[in-house]
């Protein structure tokens, strides 16, 4: 019986056909078991090609996997080019020796990056997948048709109980505090630090602690003075590229992050996240003194100063101290000169735009801040906050003379005037 000639595929198979490279973001979403499975499948695919007995050079991704490196920075040098893009070339050079690499790694080559150079064409070997296995042009197995090489997903599907989320990337890691979901457990752990306040990364220079390693890395640059990313519009320099990108949107006016509820747009995602808590009512930052919760960590920090009585922001003109830097800035404008922002309705002038905006609500009747207990509405958030103390019974302001507590700062001041009249300090 005559041997049946194999039906030739139109395109020969290269390692690129059976290889998958993740982006940085995709790689971070994989848990360790998924990464190990990926590496195992990639190495098996490569060994299948090498098992033909031909000196096929090892792509950079294989060198990285064998050394235990993460493969997401890999680009397949040698698979892009003119003549060598479709076939595996045997014209190869020895890869520079890597300290600590095995003899097997040192002996494997890397593809010539300049595939379009002049000179005689290099010998090539065409590799095909025939009847589910790899073969060369010299072989003549009795098969009816060539098959495409199995993809990574197909390889994983035929392995023993592959993790389903490796293929679908489901968000199955849920925070028990707020219900937010994540792709992997490590992202969930990092998120939960916003609830616990845990900051495991300490700066060796000043002792300041951070909840994320990346935040510590950016902070360390403040000690070295390194600011490698400079804005070409204004010359301002930044510690990291992401901060520069956000800053440049000030010049371009781009606001790519839009609220799905009200349509308001923002320069960065974190500002959008903070804004959306207005709609959801989420307040993940809780005061450990009184239990009051806030939508932003900065607001919690300012609130906690009430309990300590510390006012870290002091005016260098008159010495008056404030809880927040914004209050200090508004105060300092009083020293700077005439108020710049004037109400078109009554002519009253203010030192900053936010104060004018708050004032204009008196004329418009706008009261966007409503009490969830009784439904009473207010034009300013601070007035709603004071009102809510009627329901909660909270009295955060304490007299330093007698220890009596009050629900508002103005009540403390009025109370202390009695001591001033009596000459009591």
Swiss-Prot record:
The gene is ZNF2. May be involved in transcriptional regulation. One of its GO terms (molecular function) is zinc ion binding. It is found in: Nucleus. It comes from Bos taurus. Residues 103-116 have a biased composition (Basic and acidic residues). SMART domains: KRAB, ZnF_C2H2. A zinc finger (C2H2-type) spans 173-195, 201-223, 229-251, 257-279, 285-307, 313-335, 341-363, 369-391, 397-419. This is Zinc finger protein 2. Residues 14-85 form the KRAB domain.
